[in-house]
Amino acid sequence: APQQINDIVHRTITPLIEQQKIPGMAVAVIYQGKPYYFTWGYADIAKKQPVTQQTLFELGSVSKTFTGVLGGDAIARGEIKLSDPTTKYWPELTAKQWNGITLLHLATYTAGGLPLQVPDEVKSSSDLLRFYQNWQPAWAPGTQRLYANSSIGLFGALAVKPSGLSFEQAMQTRVFQPLKLNHTWINVPPAEEKNYAWGYREGKAVHVSPGALDAKAYGVKSTIEDMARWVQSNLKPLDINEKTLQQGIQLAQSRYWQTGDMYQGLGWEMLDWPVNPDSIINGSDNKIALAARPVKAITPPTPAVRASWVHKTGATGGFGSYVAFIPEKELGIVMLANKNYPNPARVDAAWQILNALQ
């Protein structure tokens, strides 16, 4: 990598790894549209397996950016509309609180207080229906944002229904394969398991447990190389041959709601560039990120703004990820680690690096 990139990355990430006691880490910087890769530490401590550019990390909620783009692609194909009622795609959802709740509300956490997690006891599809039928909203749809796997997870499940494909098939054929993300998985195949890092939680090696709607909300695993490609695709959608995918990426970066200086997209979250670093760093803290916040609807939604800081945090029990990019600058970063360490430390490091390179 050019000296300047090398220097700022090592100056920023080495102390982060020490402070946060991160066993293994992979970072990609996209500079003038090109990726530069850096790796540290171990994917498997017991086997002394180093992190490489082929190591698979759990993305956690960065998975939501794939779900948002897949939903955008379904919109571009004319299969769904964000303004459609949820019940159009799930007629069994007859409880009256679902009147007026649209796919947009599900995709953007604004249905009225769907919970962060789908309860663990929800296993079967009948359990899932019962859970949503019995849920009681705290607010009218489109008034408050409460970040929720149970919200965007249901959006992902319903968005693929008209295609007749399973969620995994739709994601593979419509997003992963066209973008040549050939080492990005919802279910890691046996041949790839040798590359699958262990996550570390309180010193114990862990992998994410299965759960209802997990694929849509937090289930993707990927390598630093594929994630750099993902950022490149989101930075420059016009370079993508598949027209519906190109539109889907643009729809995912459109601005549907505003809360404070943050705009909610489909999976992605945006702030105007230049950005106030305190705002992105503090805003990523779970105390703020997971709190209910009033939203202002943007009607019609603002199309993707190139002068934006576009980002998403993600975690599972043993992994912590972060992706941020600035389309106008052709600049971006991916940070993958096999420890779930605090969001503000991730965003702060990303800001230091991208701000130095802009």
Kindly label every feature range from the protein language model.
Residues 18-26, 46-106, 137-151, 215-218, ...:
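Short active-site loop at a secondary-structure junction
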Residues 38-40, 116-121, 186-190, 345-347:
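Short, solvent-exposed loop/turn and secondary-structure capping segments
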Residues 5, 9, 55, 82, ...:
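Residue-level signature of the cytosolic catalytic core of signaling kinases
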Residues 46, 126-138, 199-213, 300-307:
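The feature captures the short pre-catalytic strand/loop hairpin that immediately precedes
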Residues 4, 8-15, 61, 66, ...:
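Extracytoplasmic/secreted proteins, especially bacterial periplasmic and envelope-associated proteins
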Residues 58-62, 74-114, 118, 134-136, ...:
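Active-site helix/loop module of the DD-peptidase/beta-lactamase fold
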Residues 36, 47-49, 115-117, 277-278:
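Short, solvent-exposed loop/turn elements at domain surfaces
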Residues 1-38, 160, 165, 169-173, ...:
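Catalytic loop of the DD-peptidase/beta-lactamase superfamily, centered on the K-T-G motif
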